[in-house]
Curated annotation (Swiss-Prot):
Covalent S-S links between cysteines: none
HAMAP family, alphabetized: LepA
Cell inner membrane found in the keyword field: yes
GO MF annotation list: GTP binding; GTPase activity; ribosome binding; translation elongation factor activity
InterPro entries: EF-4, EFG_III/V, EFG_V-like, EFTu-like_2, G_TR_CS, LepA_C_sf, LepA_CTD, LepA_IV
Domain of life: Bacteria
Residues the record lists as binding GTP: 14-19, 131-134
Protein name: Elongation factor 4
EC number(s) stated in the UniProt entry for this protein: 3.6.5.n1
A biological process term (GO) from this entry: positive regulation of translation
Gene: lepA
Topology with respect to the bilayer: Peripheral membrane protein
Top class in the EC scheme: hydrolase
């Protein structure tokens, strides 16, 4: 056990986490040079293209140190995005140490700080690593100052590397062996293992990724999940070295996998504790909670005959993504589909892209919404995440919406622009303070619904790319919410209904009406497009009618002849308007829903 080191790499997005993992893998020599490729731990095409890590990956690296001993370095590669922060916290709980990776040209950013606090909470030994020292724009001295002042770490212990060029990787390996503590644990104690991730194998069922804290587990053992008391028989245990390597036993201090013929990912919850059925451990590992969806949206197939294909695709995707929540729904305008819950907007985008790419689906996705709380006059309350379920306003005493605490790190010259942006989004400024030099951290309390759409992009725009942002959930607060309906030719289109704050409703309604008026083709009669709150119309656009020139055949002569023909046309148009139906094309739905997300 003294020769094991468990660590994770935590960093802000784009600071070179996956590239550093690649170099550590190359130095350990477990992958032949001809089999090696960049971002080797990122198994999805989507991860490679976007340059982000979506799913945690684990790998056991054998390393022969300068003292002649061979060490097992267990690297747990974590996602960097705030949507997956619970996964990151479970991965960190599985380690004794962490490498805090900082880009030499960007410096300390918001998620670096957030993840550092997470590591400190779990009493991890921390090694600061300055990456990208080969860049012309690298300012190592400035970053070392930030490590001292912003993070409160000893900058003299920082290891300087260039993951891309492979500079300083040997030094980093030696530092990991020397600085990080070996795991503690008793081989004879009852089994206590933490689940920090799981994947689905078509042939073997669920593969559980675990860190064993106490005792040992081997094939044939009867294991039990402490959150739901379900029992399974272990078929195989082993470690990860890019591919799964079976072992006879997985013992205290080790990181590996367990296969036990589990058919569904929903049985294996991230953060749960595994023990033996016959010899239970005294307590579960602390910190377990259900992953709760934050953003909700409905997904419909473009053709109603493709519903069964979409159902199969979502079921398969759920096998590899336990945090995706969904139920069946239907819409008068779009037919049958699914109401889905996601961890955040990035999670929604990833699910959409995977359904379109891997399962060849053409989708319509409704405007994302958060979960609101409605309090009735009799004191009872309910949570709603679908505009269709919003009750009659006369029954409601108050509505409440979720707020977040947003931490924004920027150069101070952008303070005014960021303050304006946050105030426009109904933000409340709580504190701000200087970090190093001209860099400052601003803390705001913001409604989650206002951050959901394009806040991050707008922040990058007003700070010319220098702003970084991280958030955590706070609580629910009273808010003036209304249900905004869109009417086309007097008929409500349920798929375009949305919940909005009173102050933003008119702006949203105008925008939706304008987009629809540009996309719906003209008919032989006028089409009014209206935004309404209850019975009150708050915005309107009109698509003018196509007209046939009925007076073309009248050459000269009496004006009353022309008037008679025009009156006849007007009557026909009136009758057409009462019985005419407007078919809304798919492009119109897509235009409105896309514009809601931008």
């Amino acid at each position: 056990m003294n020769r094991i080191r468990n660590f994770s790499i935590i960093a802000h997005i784009d600071h070179g986490k996956s590239t550093l993992s690649d170099r550590l893998i190359q130095v350990s020599g477990i992958v032949a040079a001809r089999d090696f490729r960049d971002q080797i731990l990122d198994s999805m095409d989507l991860e490679r293209e976007r340059g982000i890590t979506i799913k945690s990956q684990t790998i056991c690296l054998p390393y022969k140190a300068k003292d002649g001993a061979v060490y097992s370095l267990n690297l747990i590669d974590t996602p960097g995005h705030v949507d997956f922060s619970y996964e990151v916290s479970r991965a960190i709980a599985s380690c004794e140490g962490a490498l805090i990776l900082i880009d030499a040209s960007q410096g300390v950013e918001a998620q670096t700080v957030a993840n550092l606090y997470l590591a400190v909470d779990h009493d991890l030994e921390i090694i600061p690593v300055i990456n990208k020292i080969d860049l012309i724009s690298a300012d190592v001295e400035r970053v070392m100052e930030q490590i001292e002042e912003d993070l409160g770490l000893d900058s003299s212990a920082a290891v300087k590397v260039s993951a891309k060029e492979g500079v300083g990787i040997e030094d980093l390996m030696e530092t990991i062996v020397a600085k990080l503590p070996p795991p503690k644990g008793n081989l004879e104690a009852p089994l206590q293992a933490l689940i920090f991730d799981s994947t689905y194998d078509d042939f073997r069922g669920t593969v559980i990724h675990v860190r064993v804290f106490e005792g040992k587990v081997k094939p044939g053992d009867m294991i039990m999940f402490m959150s739901n008391d379900s029992v399974y028989k272990v078929e195989e245990v082993g470690i990860f070295q890019i591919v799964r390597k079976p072992r006879k036993v997985l013992a205290a201090g080790e990181v590996g996998y367990i296969i036990a013929g589990i058919k569904s990912l929903s049985d294996t919850r991230c953060g749960d504790t595994i023990t033996l059925k016959t010899n239970r451990c005294a307590a579960a590992m602390p910190g377990f909670r259900e992953a709760k969806p934050v953003v909700f949206s409905s997904i419909f197939p473009i053709g109603s005959d493709e519903y069964e294909d979409l159902a199969t695709a979502i079921d398969k995707l759920k096998l590899n993504d336990a945090s995706l929540v969904y139920e069946k729904t239907s819409s008068l305008a779009l037919g049958f589909g699914f109401r889905c819950g996601f961890l955040g907007l990035l999670h929604l985008e990833i699910v959409q892209e995977r359904l379109e790419r891997e399962y060849d689906q053409s989708l319509i996705i409704t405007a994302p919404t958060v979960r609101y709380e409605v309090v009735y006059h009799d004191g009872t309350s309910m949570f709603i995440d679908n505009p269709e379920l919003f009750p009659d306003p006369t029954l409601i005493q108050t509505t409440r919406e979720p707020f977040i605490k947003a931490s924004i790190i920027i150069p101070d010259k952008y303070m005014g622009a960021v303050m304006t942006l946050c105030m426009e989004r109904r933000g409340i400024s709580t504190t701000y303070h200087y970090l190093t030099g001209s860099r400052m951290e601003m803390v705001f309390e913001l409604p989650l619904a206002e951050v959901m759409y394009d806040f991050y992009d707008k922040l990058k725009t007003v700070t010319q790319g220098y702003g970084s942002f991280d958030y955590e959930m706070l609580d629910y607060r009273d808010s003036r919410l209304v249900k905004l309906d869109i009417l086309v030719n007097g008929e409500r289109v349920d798929a375009l209904s949305q919940l909005a704050h009173e102050d933003k409703a008119v702006e949203r309604a105008r925008h939706a009406c304008k987009m629809l008026s540009e996309e719906i083709p003209r008919q032989m009669f006028k089409i009014p497009i209206q935004g309404a709150i209850g019975g009150k119309i708050i915005s309107r656009e009109t698509i003018s009618a196509l007209r046939k020139d009925v007076t073309a055949k009248c050459y000269g002569g009496d004006i009353s002849r022309k008037r008679k023909l025009l009156e006849k046309q007007k009557k026909g148009k009136k009758r057409m308007k009462t019985i005419g139906k407007v078919a809304i094309p798919q492009s119109a739905f897509l235009a409105v829903l896309k514009s809601d997300q931008t």
